[in-house]
Amino acid sequence: MSSPVIHILNGDALGDQFPKDLPGETLVFRECLIEGPRKEVEFEAFFTSRAAYLSDTYDPTIKESYSQELSIPLMKVVTDLKPSEVVLWFEEDLFCQANFWFVCHFLLSSGYRGKVSWAKPSGTARYNFGLLSKESLMAVFEDRLPVDIAKITLLWQASSVNDSDELIRLVEGITDLSEYIIPAALAYRDMNTSTIEQSRPYLSLLEITKTQKTTHFGKAFMAFCKKEAVYGFGDIQVKRIFDKVVAHEN
């Protein structure tokens, strides 16, 4: 069975606001590939390790739902649906970029040879689809950018082995898209330091707690999201780092 277009969305929030008038089917990519196991020999084992990690780290029910809601539908894109185009709806922050790089890697490695494009928000919405109306999302679709998944695959491969220098070098070589990806690549480098105390997220939270004279997580989280929007972290990711900052200072 062939489907003309498959839209792979970056999360449930976008799924809720996604324009119904756009042609094709949708798949929500519920992952967090900035953390946890990222090296894979083959995809079945990789997805199994991801389901176990997310279940242990976030929600025990994920282990049961992961295959039905993510890995099996993703496999069907390349084995059954075989669309003429896959549209990737991902923002420019690192959280989304890591997922974007992996999906491109998956498509290439699975033998997909159709068209791939990137429907990305821009301007003040570059890190947040939620700022856009349905009409604006339609415009994002119309302005989608062509993607060479062979080049983006290399970004996943470099990041999955924590080679920040190679990641940045590769991004700089993708001249048509580098301006949109380089901030996330630099943020990745600044996060993957030899100790967490040297990392940019840690140092930013340390500065926030000192300048605002607060150990209140809610306030620190809001300030971090504003200062370091390029990371796209959720509250759980920030809370882990925040707790280390507070513990170190006490």
Summary of predicted features, one role per range:
Residues 16-20, 38-39, 96-104, 127-131:
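A short acidic (Asp/Glu
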